[in-house]
Amino acid sequence: MQAAIHYRVASAVPASHRFHITLTIAQPDPQGQCLWLPDWIPGSYMIRDFARNITKLNAIDSLGRTVVCRALDKSSWQCAPVDGPLTVNYEVYAWDLSVRSAHLDQHHGYFNGTSLFLAVAGQEANAVSVELCCPEGVVDWQVATTLPRLTAAPLGFGCYGAENYDALIDHPVEMGRFSYAEFEAAGVPHAIAI
């Protein structure tokens, strides 16, 4: 189940510390789609520079033709107008063990949405889907996130969703080998991944 705004998160070589993101926009702005990455993270409103970790960014139209993208400032880009869907491919360098950014190596992956998910300007209120792909060469990793599952099995890779961009960036993702437990405290269900 893919939304009109769909993100695919993958990594060919986790030890490279790079997430590969494919963003597909079914109905981009006919004047040229703007994309942006927040300079803040929910719960920590210091100005941050997450966009500095985007190492490559390119786009293609539905026929596979290159679409020109230009930087507008340090955290936003504009793609040339296209007819039909727009696909944006980019890499994010993930080598920050803090809880605010992203980290990826051969042992685990972690990210906050503010570090990985470019916002689609003018469509932030739209529902989104996210396909989390198991990194190549990995066989026993699981996924811990509060993102609502669409087709993913519990603790599994697959498709997740969010009602809008704000909801998307409010759900961190951890992937790797971990112990998982569920319990109830004061009538409230809890889950923990360690």
Please describe what each predicted stretch is.
Residues 1-39:
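Early extracytoplasmic/domain-onset interaction patches
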